[in-house]
Design a protein with these regions (language model features):
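Amphipathic, Lys/Arg-enriched alpha-helical "gate/interface" segment within cytosolic domains
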Residues: 1-132
Length: 132
């Protein structure tokens, strides 16, 4: 069952070490902090074995620079907590893809990332290419 706060929701993928978040519309820094804490709590048991994160951004509005900075902080926290790969489902939005790539780059974590149109494509990539 998904946990929800404002524009954000978080759930785990049954049988896999994957946390999926989805957003709709405009988010804010408080929701992003909640998102970070909720994802970390959901993945806490997998720190030693590794896990993956999927962000379904396909229905999100672009973020502000301040929100982008919060996403950079989130990325660092996820990697420090054992996240091995980030997968982004961005629909057909070039803007969301560019923002996600820049935020990951700014995190300076070197985490593996993939960009996809759908969550199903992201799940397949994590299974076939990342083995999660």
């Amino acid at each position: 069952m998904a946990k929800k706060n404002g524009a954000q929701s978080v759930e785990t993928i049954p049988g896999r070490k994957i946390v999926l978040s989805a957003g709709v519309g405009k988010t804010n820094i408080d929701e992003l902090k909640w998102l970070t804490d909720t994802v970390l709590a959901s993945a806490s048991a997998w720190k030693s074995t590794g896990w993956a994160y999927i962000a379904d951004c396909s229905q999100m509005s672009p973020v502000t620079p301040a929100e982008g900075s919060e996403l950079v902080t989130m990325t660092k926290k996820f990697v420090n907590a054992g996240c091995k790969a980030f997968a982004f489902a961005e629909g057909k939005s070039i803007m969301l893809k560019v923002q996600a790539q820049k935020n990951t780059q700014r995190s300076e974590t070197g985490v593996l990332e993939g960009h996809f149109v759908t969550v199903d494509e992201a799940l397949a990539w994590l299974k076939n290419e990342v083995n999660i």
